[in-house]
């Protein structure tokens, strides 16, 4: 079963510039280190155990899953779920029709030299970014997640992830199979969209589809295809700040109401 959102992935052109901009927004940004596949990252950790991964490339890496998506622009591009049984949930997703790889080993070397190791099951093809990728730590999870959870802007965790989709029946089947419960129907007049919302641990994941051709989601689907669209954050104080969208590098982030 999914335990909650592990992290959201924001792909950017220049890691140092993006990390600096997120610091200007009041986030405590920690250097994550390098992956051996040509990418490096910076992390924004929250007290609920989730985090934002800001990722870029320090060398050309055309086989990387986020290399081609970055060519269409910086943005929120993918999401990872914690699971209490990686092999079982990978198998369940595959039985539901999700194109997902068997668990494979990944690693990252932190700036202090510590090598982190984990297993990932990666949704691929048209399911990338719609179905989550799944993670199981081989080294202690607390070594992977920074302990710097205090942010000047009051951010305390992920609230709701919104994923734009062209139809709902498949994701409804996936999540009901994994979670064993029905979603809540949702509608958003501003987005001119409707969808389904699943509670996953402390987080919400909503899949939204446009109901008019003028919906912002319709344009998103034309440009990027089904994929993460936006996310809200939880705040530790009553009057959360408004983010300067120019500093978010294409990621639609806001504090939930």
Identify the role of each PLM range.
Residues 36-38:
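Membrane-anchoring hydrophobic segments
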Residues 1-5, 11-30, 46-185, 189-257:
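Glyoxalase I/VOC metalloenzyme domain signal
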């Amino acid at each position: 079963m999914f335990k909650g959102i592990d992290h959201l992935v924001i792909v950017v052109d220049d890691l140092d510039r993006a990390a600096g901009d997120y610091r200007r927004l009041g986030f405590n940004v920690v250097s994550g280190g390098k992956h051996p596949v040509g990418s490096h990252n910076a992390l924004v950790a929250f007290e609920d155990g989730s985090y934002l991964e800001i990722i870029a490339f320090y060398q050309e890496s055309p086989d990387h899953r986020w290399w081609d998506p970055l060519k269409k622009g910086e943005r929120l591009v993918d999401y990872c779920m914690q699971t209490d049984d990686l092999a079982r949930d990978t198998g369940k997703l595959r039985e539901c029709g999700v194109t997902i790889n068997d668990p494979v080993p990944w690693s990252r070397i932190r700036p202090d030299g510590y090598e982190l190791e984990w297993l990932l099951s990666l949704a691929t093809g048209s399911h990338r970014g719609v179905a989550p990728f799944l993670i199981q730590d081989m080294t202690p999870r607390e070594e992977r997640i920074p302990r710097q959870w205090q942010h000047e802007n009051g951010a305390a965790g992920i609230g709701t992830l919104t994923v734009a989709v062209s139809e709902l029946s498949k994701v409804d089947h996936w999540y009901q199979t994994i979670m064993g419960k029905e979603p809540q129907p949702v509608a958003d007049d501003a987005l001119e969209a409707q969808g389904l919302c699943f509670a996953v641990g402390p987080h919400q994941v909503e899949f939204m589809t446009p109901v008019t051709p003028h919906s912002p989601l319709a344009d998103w689907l034309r440009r990027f295809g089904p994929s993460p669209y936006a996310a809200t954050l939880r705040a530790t104080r009553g009057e959360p700040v408004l983010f300067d969208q120019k500093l978010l590098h294409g990621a639609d982030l806001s504090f939930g109401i």
